[in-house]
Amino acid sequence: MNKNIILVCLIFSFLQGRGQYPGYALSDHPDAFKKSFAGATAATESIQSDFSQEKSLTMLSEKINSTGKFWYRRKDKLRLEYVRPYAYVMILNSGKILIREGQKENTISANSNKVFQQVNRILIDCVSGTMLDNPDFQSRVFESAGSFLIELKPLAKNLKELYRNINIVIDKKDYTAVAIEMFELSGDTTIIRFQNKQLNAQIPDSVFRIP
């Protein structure tokens, strides 16, 4: 009887690892991935790309779609600029966060607010390859033919109150993020997909300037 229970549990665990994300299986070599990922990101000085965002809200039947531009420069400079359907800019630079919406600007110190500090780290971790070392999350690595999927489950209390999990999809060719998927406890989801990536191009300081 006990053997049958153990067998059922093992089968369930195996199926859960394979079926949770269609097309992906739990990686047998997460340490090898981590080493390759760290090596590739260490050689990446900058990234710029277009992005599209798809947001699904439990209160709305239609999805909200946005597009924009993305810039990152090693190791703590990032700009996310929404172009359509509205203008919105977020800049992270050396512990400061600037948010510009229309004519309104607001500058925040990430260190003065625990949530902003964690959000700042999440965004930087996603593009710099350090998310597997973030103590605020428990991670698992899944693998498909063309990409890896890093599943991050929040451990920090305030993040657990917001997110069920955050997934980062990594391209096997260059080990850069293809997509960031955020699943909130409320049932809302946000998926950001990156296209037309350019690696190690010169990005002027003005892109990340915070007055």
Regions found by a protein language model. Give the residues of each.
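Positively charged n-region of N-terminal signal peptides that target proteins for export
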Residues: 1-4
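Hydrophobic h-region of N-terminal signal peptides that target proteins for export
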Residues: 9-18
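Gly/Pro-enriched, hydrophobic low-complexity segments
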Residues: 19, 108, 132-211
